[in-house]
């Protein structure tokens, strides 16, 4: 067993008290990314090693694996703690997105180790989609490369505002301050083109030797800033969703018996209280919150990120994919939008193609109307293209089969982010971030009688194969 962990548990007064203390720590999700062999996996292994998160059996296994697959001679190859796939160990690269967990006395962390090779950019985008901070590794011998620019742009495109530029392998350039200063200046010049108001920090380090990772380096006395671990422990993550209006996508209608009907999901943004008036989209029907049910019992209020079940005072028609928001909020469903796309399939994305798209719990179909441009990640310029290739990033105009309640991605990633699904293979082929909504052709408001609405709901519920259109959602089909 990890002796440090055992000591922490003893200090807290037992396992239960330790687990409660862990629950109250803040959580930081971050990813490591950069060019091939910049030392991403080694850095994560060093963090785990120097924060004493490795168990004795893991350390013993690491010694054996280092002899068979290691690339560091007689030294421990800390990258093997993360490179779990056999193909990764044999090739000496990271292929899949590897997730690891560790904690310190101040904070707990979830790490995503993402691939450096260009052909695995789609894997990197997947890892970045849930993170608050990105560590961009740069080889001190090579400086800023194309893949560094690509990963920087993808990170900011996916809403990451905190970038830590870790200039690694300083031991191979004799820990020279001028090398660090030159790379820092080069990156800041490039970063002027990145979108948004970014928090960028620079740390010179050596993941292999441990310099400035968890402890200050005696080899770089010219650097007076914090270590990488200190940056991770103290960075103030301001999540935009905490300040946004309430959004609650319904993931599941929970009805275990005739006396209970609740709507389960994760509160995407804002907060909700018992007694608050809410509105359901796309129907527009209003009700009020009777209960907020959680695993730990009922609550009076829930905040963004909490998994909850809402019980309403009225028995109304709500299905998976519907969106609940405050009754006084206005969010007009849209059928047209401009979407930033990261394409992940071998077959290029082209105008005229149709895909299934999934947004929160909602699944519908969409058609590609036009590709506005592809972004050249070397200089972040826009160029006209007829199609978007594998790993291509560009702006696309789309039309949905039915009006969707959408937010701008930078304001709310949950209700502004979607994935493209191939209709034949059911494989995820792309990721989309809503840039701009277009309300042209919005369906005019039509008043239906209560009988018409109830009959329509009855037919759609019990005879889905009729493909009856939703009178309130403008879902076209044959009645």
From Swiss-Prot:
Its EC number is 2.7.7.4. Residues 34-41 are annotated as: G1. SUPFAM superfamilies: EF-Tu/eEF-1alpha/eIF2-gamma C-terminal domain (SSF50465), P-loop containing nucleoside triphosphate hydrolases (SSF52540), Translation proteins (SSF50447). The keyword Cytoplasm does not apply. It comes from the Bacteria. GO terms for molecular function: ATP binding; GTP binding; GTPase activity; sulfate adenylyltransferase (ATP) activity. Keywords: ATP-binding, GTP-binding, Nucleotide-binding, Nucleotidyltransferase, Transferase. Pfam families: GTP-eEF1A_C, GTP_EFTU. The keyword Nucleotide-binding applies. One of its GO terms (biological process) is sulfate assimilation. It is an enzyme of class 2 (transferase). Residues 168-171 are annotated as: G4. GTP binds at residues 34-41, 113-117, 168-171. Residues 206-208 are annotated as: G5. Pathway: Sulfur metabolism; hydrogen sulfide biosynthesis; sulfite from sulfate: step 1/3. It catalyses: sulfate + ATP + H(+) = adenosine 5'-phosphosulfate + diphosphate. Residues 113-116 are annotated as: G3. PROSITE patterns: G_TR_1, G_TR_2. Residues 92-96 are annotated as: G2. Heterodimer composed of CysD, the smaller subunit, and CysN. Belongs to the TRAFAC class translation factor GTPase superfamily. Classic translation factor GTPase family. CysN/NodQ subfamily. With CysD forms the ATP sulfurylase (ATPS) that catalyzes the adenylation of sulfate producing adenosine 5'-phosphosulfate (APS) and diphosphate, the first enzymatic step in sulfur assimilation pathway. APS synthesis involves the formation of a high-energy phosphoric-sulfuric acid anhydride bond driven by GTP hydrolysis by CysN coupled to ATP hydrolysis by CysD. This is Sulfate adenylyltransferase subunit 1. It comes from Salmonella heidelberg (strain SL476).
């Amino acid at each position: 067993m990890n002796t440090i962990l055992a000591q922490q548990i003893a200090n807290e007064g037992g396992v239960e008290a330790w687990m409660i203390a862990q629950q109250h720590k803040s959580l930081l999700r971050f990813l490591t990314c950069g060019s091939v062999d910049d030392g991403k996996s080694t850095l994560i292994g060093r963090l785990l090693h120097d924060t004493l998160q490795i168990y004795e059996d893991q350390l013993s296994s690491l010694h054996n694996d280092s002899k068979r697959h290691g690339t560091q001679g007689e030294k421990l190859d800390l990258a093997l703690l993360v490179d779990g796939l056999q193909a990764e160990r044999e090739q000496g690269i990271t292929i899949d997105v590897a997730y690891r967990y560790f904690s310190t006395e101040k904070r707990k962390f979830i790490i995503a180790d993402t691939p450096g090779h260009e052909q695995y950019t789609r894997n990197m985008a997947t890892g970045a989609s849930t993170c608050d901070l990105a560590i961009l590794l740069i080889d001190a011998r090579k400086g800023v490369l194309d893949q560094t620019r690509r990963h920087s742009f993808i990170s900011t495109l996916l809403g990451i505002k905190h970038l830590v530029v870790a200039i690694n392998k300083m031991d191979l350039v004799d820990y020279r301050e001028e090398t660090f200063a030159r790379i820092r200046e080069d990156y800041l010049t490039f970063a002027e083109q990145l979108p948004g108001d970014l928090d960028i920090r620079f740390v010179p380090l050596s993941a292999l030797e441990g310099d400035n990772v968890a402890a200050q380096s005696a080899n770089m006395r010219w650097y007076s800033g914090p270590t990488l671990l200190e940056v991770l422990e103290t960075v103030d993550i301001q999540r935009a969703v905490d300040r946004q209006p309430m959004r609650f996508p319904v993931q599941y209608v929970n009805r275990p018996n005739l006396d209970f009907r609740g709507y389960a999901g994760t509160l995407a943004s804002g907060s909700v209280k018992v007694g608050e008036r809410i509105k359901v989209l796309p129907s527009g029907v209003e009700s009020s919150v009777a209960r907020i049910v959680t695993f730990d019992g009922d609550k009076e209020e829930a905040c963004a990120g909490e998994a909850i079940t809402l019980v309403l005072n009225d028995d109304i028609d709500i299905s998976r994919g519907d969106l609940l928001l405050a009754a006084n909020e206005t969010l007009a469903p849209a059928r047209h939008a401009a979407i930033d796309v990261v394409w992940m399939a071998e077959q290029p994305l082209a105008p005229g193609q149709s895909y299934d798209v999934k947004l929160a719990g909602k699944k519908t179909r969409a058609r590609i109307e036009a590709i506005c441009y592809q972004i050249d990640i070397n200089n972040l310029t826009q160029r006209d293209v007829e199609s978007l290739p594998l790993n291509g990033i560009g702006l696309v105009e789309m039309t949905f089969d039915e009006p969707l309640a959408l937010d701008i991605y930078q304001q709310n990633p949950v209700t502004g982010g979607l994935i493209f699904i191939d209709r034949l293979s059911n494989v995820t082929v792309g990721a989309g971030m809503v840039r701009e909504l277009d309300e042209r052709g919005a369906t005019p408001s039509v008043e239906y009688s209560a009988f018409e609405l109830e009959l329509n709901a009855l037919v759609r519920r019990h005879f889905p194969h009729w493909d009856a259109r939703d009178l309130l959602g403008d879902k076209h089909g044959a009645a």
